Curated annotation (Swiss-Prot):
One GO term of the biological process aspect: thiamine diphosphate biosynthetic process
Cofactors demanded by this protein: Mg(2+)
Molecular functions per Gene Ontology: magnesium ion binding; thiamine-phosphate diphosphorylase activity
Protein name, as recorded: Thiamine-phosphate synthase
CC annotations in GO: cytoplasm
Keywords on record: Magnesium, Metal-binding, Thiamine biosynthesis, Transferase
Enzyme class: transferase
EC number of the protein: 2.5.1.3
Length: 213
């Protein structure tokens, strides 16, 4: 069952997003201990794990998340999400259609990326629990990212659909969260702000403070 508070501090990570001196297991566990509210396994890039290696890692990270009662979301990979019985799946505009995914994930969390009004207009939100809006700011984590849309886009979507849970993504760090919260976002999703943080506990707690007031 989806709860929009899951979106508060939503950590996204894959093996290519962690510093060379740390493992993804270490980074994720530090983030879980600090209190992230949702985790998305996003294994992308030239060095991304595939096949059984990806499956084994997904199961290990899922087990870690469940030890801390944090839902485990899979990015894009429908077959992987089904195989490990993930808590949910997040897809982009170019991925499998949400309606088809909903047939397999009737009791799971479904997220959809939307970057502008055009994508919003053509998106089927019937089966979607939340939308990921962005990139809000310029981001180094996604080389194929759209042009930044700013916090204003969140306010626009909230005005159009006040009940739709929204998580902001793209270039977010502890110093630029305030405008996103003011725009009405239910949470923030980050990659490098946590994965490359020198003090993950401090970073996560600063993010949490914006949604605990």
């Amino acid at each position: 069952m989806f709860n929009q508070s899951y979106l508060n501090v939503y950590f996204i990570c894959g093996t290519s997003n962690v510093p060379s001196h740390r493992t993804i297991h270490e980074v994720l566990e530090a983030a879980l201990k600090a209190g992230i509210t949702l985790f998305q396994f996003r294994e992308k890039g030239e060095s991304a794990l595939k096949g059984n290696d990806k499956l084994v890692l997904a199961k290990e990270l899922q087990h870690l998340c469940h030890q801390y009662n944090v839902p485990f979301i899979v990015n894009d990979d429908v077959s992987l999400a089904k195989e490990i019985n993930a808590d949910g799946i997040h897809v982009g505009q170019d991925d499998a259609k949400v309606k088809e995914i909903a047939q397999y994930f009737t009791d799971k969390i479904i997220g959809l990326s939307i970057s502008d009004l055009g994508e919003y207009a053509k998106s089927d939100l019937t089966h979607v629990d939340y939308i990921g809006v962005g990139p809000i700011y310029p981001t180094p984590s996604k080389h194929d990212a759209h042009t930044p849309v700013g916090p204003e886009m969140i306010a626009t979507f909230k005005e159009m659909n006040p009940q739709l849970p929204i998580v902001a993504i793209g270039g977010i760090n502890t110093s630029n969260v305030a405008p996103i919260v003011e725009a009405g976002a239910n949470g923030i999703s980050v990659i490098s702000a946590i994965s490359k943080s020198e003090n993950i506990e401090k970073t996560v707690n600063r993010f949490k403070d914006f949604f605990n007031n």
